[in-house]
Amino acid sequence: MWQLNENQVYLPPPTPVATIVSTDEYVQRTSLYYHAGSTRLLTIGHPYFELKKPNGDVSVPKVSGHQYRVFRVRLPDPNKFGLSDTSLFNSETQRLVWACVGVEVGRGQPLGVGISGHPYFNKDEDVENSSVYGTVPGQDSRENVAMDYKQTQLCIVGCTPPIGEYWGMGTPCNASKVSPGDCPVLELKSEVIEDGDMVDAGFGAMDFASLQANKSDVPLDLCTSISKYPDYLGMAAEPYGNSLFFFLRREQMFVRHFFNRAGTTGDSVPNDLYITGSSNRASIAGSIYYSTPSGSLVTSDSQIFNKPLWIQKAQGHNNGICFGNQLFVTVVDTTRSTNLTLCAATQSPTPTPYDNSKFKEYLRHGEEFDLQFIFQLCVITLNAEVMTYIHAMDSSLLDDWNFKIGPPASATLEDTYRFLTNKAIACQRDAPPKEKEDPYKKYKFWEVNLTEKFSSQLDQFPLGRKFLMQAGLRTGPKFKSRKRPAPTSSSSSGSVTPKRKKTKR
């Protein structure tokens, strides 16, 4: 008896899958190098929250040592450079791009540990060295608790923004069956890391504003924020490798204290996991345990900043090419998170004797950065294959280079009116061309403009001298020695020509 073959037949894709290649395959590097550096970059604000005016405008921003600093570095268009060597590239078929070969992130300010806390922190019992079992918390048992955070140093370099991940509120399959007080549904989300986003402080990468309704389970700077962790897996798997040329990180943490939470335990401990007690242990104590983090010792021996970093080979397919004439540098440094305590007297002169009510205390946190780069000039030959590849990666690049890929021929019949100024017909005026939109305009970055900061005199800058030394390159002497020319017969009228010595043969 004939039977239908139930094995599935897999058909090949209708179009061939494009192969992702390294930028080294179509980018030719030149021998021209440039240095570019920022000015001293400073920011200062309140370490826990932003201060607002009565109309809602921000008067003092939130500036914490546990925030991401995402610098969007703007580079000049190399195709508009006035190069002395006109034979370097053909403007008809080639375009110039920058390749980042060196970077140094400078950090100012002394090493220090900043702490954070909450005046209404959800701390019930000390479960590390408990002396009393299962005290029943009152209606409000929150306490004033402070702690230091996990220690993190991080530097990510790419030509597109970095991606972060966190646990957020998910959508349940049947929303109608969700009751108040049910455990929220979790979903792993990936988003662009923006300047000012909070790092993982030791309480996990999550949306605290959505997942902690009491606003008391974490310190003030986290309770209404989203803590993001770099999505290293996602950025490493990116086909073109634009968001992550390389990264350096150093993380450390240990647990300082062990507590449990006050409140009704949502997931009760199963009865088969314990034997019922008696007396003051008849009711089982709370089992929502948690720990307070600590980053431990801060030392200059473990610093990853204030050092030159050289890009020989990127981990992805993009080997340091700055497409779009921009670079994104993401920095985290919690080893300089000291919070400054300021005090102002409410009366003048300073009141005596001392009275606490006559002084106001304030908190501020300041940060200092300096960015230095070494860029190499590169050439891309735009043949049909390369243009198709770049168009698939980012179609806006060809528009920036004044290359257009024509639309396919239309088979429909189009209308063309004879009299364009005829009031009897609809307006035939062409719509004005749309301005190019910034694909990252909805994100917040620290803008750093280096369009007028490029210099080919590498030996005039600290990072440039380091690059020349490690590359084995030497610059010519700045001052040429001037020797006195030898006298000639016409230089002095009284000169005597020496006689030629005779030799015997």
Curated annotation (Swiss-Prot):
Organism: Human papillomavirus 7
Biased composition (Low complexity): 486-497
Keywords per UniProt: Capsid protein, Disulfide bond, Host nucleus, Host-virus interaction, Late protein, T=7 icosahedral capsid protein, Viral attachment to host cell, Viral penetration into host cytoplasm, Virion, Virus endocytosis by host, Virus entry into host cell
Region feature Disordered, mapped onto this chain: 474-505
Entry's family note: Belongs to the papillomaviridae L1 protein family.
Pfam family, one: Late_protein_L1
MF (Gene Ontology): structural molecule activity
Superkingdom classification of source: Viruses
Cellular compartments annotated: Virion; Host nucleus
Name the UniProt record assigns to this protein: Major capsid protein L1
